[in-house]
Swiss-Prot record:
Disulfide bonds: none annotated. This is Putative pyruvate, phosphate dikinase regulatory protein 2. GO terms for molecular function: ADP binding; ATP binding; phosphotransferase activity, phosphate group as acceptor; protein serine/threonine kinase activity. It catalyses: N(tele)-phospho-L-histidyl/L-threonyl-[pyruvate, phosphate dikinase] + ADP = N(tele)-phospho-L-histidyl/O-phospho-L-threonyl-[pyruvate, phosphate dikinase] + AMP + H(+); N(tele)-phospho-L-histidyl/O-phospho-L-threonyl-[pyruvate, phosphate dikinase] + phosphate + H(+) = N(tele)-phospho-L-histidyl/L-threonyl-[pyruvate, phosphate dikinase] + diphosphate. It comes from Latilactobacillus sakei subsp. sakei (strain 23K) (Lactobacillus sakei subsp. sakei). Bifunctional serine/threonine kinase and phosphorylase involved in the regulation of the pyruvate, phosphate dikinase (PPDK) by catalyzing its phosphorylation/dephosphorylation. The lineage of its organism: Bacteria, Bacillati, Bacillota, Bacilli, Lactobacillales.
Length: 265
């Protein structure tokens, strides 16, 4: 079967049309193929006219995401005159919302793409959280919006990732007795540092369950009451030394703790 020609015409990058076409194409067997040509950043009649002529020559389906009413009207009239199939993705909904709200649309190309900048910031924050998870690189402590400290199993990593999804750059560092702390930590402003803790009994239970899940014996320092108690005491000492805000994460969901942190920083 000959590939079906499709022209995407947009005054932005045409990603909205591409996504819709991909979703529709997935509903057909592999024998149905599309020849997609994308024409982005079309902002004047001079550029638009030859594209429409080429579409006519190829008998293409035109998929448009033009926010400029004048340009879209040109496409509509051309398709009607030449009997071309036109899929106008934006105009029907734009008109409906405009009529219902009694408000004219902005006709600003790329508005959705500008919103996508928020997405890229979030991805950057998540990459930051992965790079500086578990004290992998202490240099991240100085670049972070939030620094999480705590002994093992106090939810440092899941909290880091959740907060990163809220656009915060988060680094976390495990507190282990007799392991020197990086010098960078003492340069971080106190208001950025959050100490995570919980009662000894709760932490012991969590660690014991962790060992059971891994099929490991319970007779290790990891779940020894005295050792774990010493870890918590050491962590509290560091929190006090750094003047860090301390949060008891026991019986709190990740979402609840993250929300509390956001109100504190």
């Amino acid at each position: 079967m000959t590939a079906i020609p499709i022209f995407i015409i947009s005054d932005s990058i045409g990603e909205t049309a591409r996504t819709v076409i991909a979703a529709v194409n997935a509903q057909f067997p592999a024998s149905v193929t599309l020849k997609i040509q994308r024409f982005p950043f079309i902002t004047d009649q001079k550029t638009l006219t030859p594209i429409l002529q080429d579409a006519h020559q190829e008998q293409a389906i035109i998929v448009s995401t033009l926010v400029n009413h004048t340009l879209q009207e040109t496409v509509t009239q051309f398709c009607q005159a030449k009997h071309l199939t036109l899929i106008d993705l934006l105009s029907p909904l734009t008109t409906a919302i405009s009529e219902r709200s009694q408000t004219a649309s902005l006709e600003t190309p790329g508005s959705l793409r500008k919103l996508d900048e928020h997405y890229f910031h979030r991805i950057s924050a998540m990459e930051f959280a992965v790079r500086y998870d578990d004290g992998q690189d202490p240099r991240g402590l100085l670049e972070a919006d939030i620094v999480l400290l705590g002994v093992s199993r106090t939810s440092k990593t899941p909290l880091s990732m959740y907060l990163a999804n809220q656009n915060y750059r988060v680094a976390n560092l495990p507190l282990i007795p007799n392991v020197p702390l990086p010098k960078e930590l003492f340069k971080v402003p106190a208001h950025k540092i959050i100490g995570l803790t919980m009662p000894l009994s709760t932490l012991l239970k969590i660690r014991q369950e962790r060992l059971a899940t891994l099929g490991l014996p319970q007779t290790t320092n990891y779940s020894n009451m005295t050792t774990v108690g010493d870890e918590l005491a050491y962590a509290n000492q560091i929190f006090e030394q750094l003047n860090a805000t301390t949060i008891n994460v026991a019986d709190r969901s990740i979402e609840e703790t993250a929300s509390l942190i956001q109100t504190l920083i």
